[in-house]
């Protein structure tokens, strides 16, 4: 996994609730060529959505996702981009909680 994602940006949006997270994920994937790699139910109703792609695309996607999330209500908690995550960060992303896969 690490070899195919090295040098690819990581975008994250954390929301209060599932509806803003879905809205953000939809907006991110429509706004730029990014791959929706996962979601994490953090607890207490918080959901984090993660995308990967080229830095410019991830930047545009996270901005669009954050804007869409704010339109749903006050669901946006945080939005952040890591341009090139260190290889030591990659195992933390591989939690098996990816969209489209059965648990």
UniProtKB/Swiss-Prot annotation:
Homohexamer with a small central pore. Forms a CsoS2-CsoS1-RuBisCO complex. The tight homohexamer forms a pore with an opening of about 5 Angstroms in diameter. The lineage of its organism: Bacteria, Bacillati, Cyanobacteriota, Cyanophyceae, Synechococcales. Belongs to the bacterial microcompartments protein family. CsoS1 subfamily. Residues 9-94 form the BMC domain. One of its GO terms (cellular component) is carboxysome. This is Carboxysome shell protein CsoS1. It comes from the Bacteria. It holds the Pfam family BMC. One of its GO terms (molecular function) is structural constituent of carboxysome shell.
């Amino acid at each position: 996994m690490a070899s195919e994602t090295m040098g690819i940006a990581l975008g994250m949006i954390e929301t209060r609730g599932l509806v803003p997270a879905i809205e953000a994920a939809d907006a991110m994937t429509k706004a730029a060529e990014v791959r929706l790699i996962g979601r994490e139910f953090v607890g207490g109703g918080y959901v984090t959505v993660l995308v990967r792609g080229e830095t410019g695309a991830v930047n545009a996607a996270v901005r669009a996702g954050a804007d869409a999330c704010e339109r749903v209500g006050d669901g946006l908690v945080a939005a952040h981009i890591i341009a090139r995550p260190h290889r030591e960060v990659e195992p933390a992303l591989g939690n098996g909680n990816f969209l489209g896969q059965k648990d």
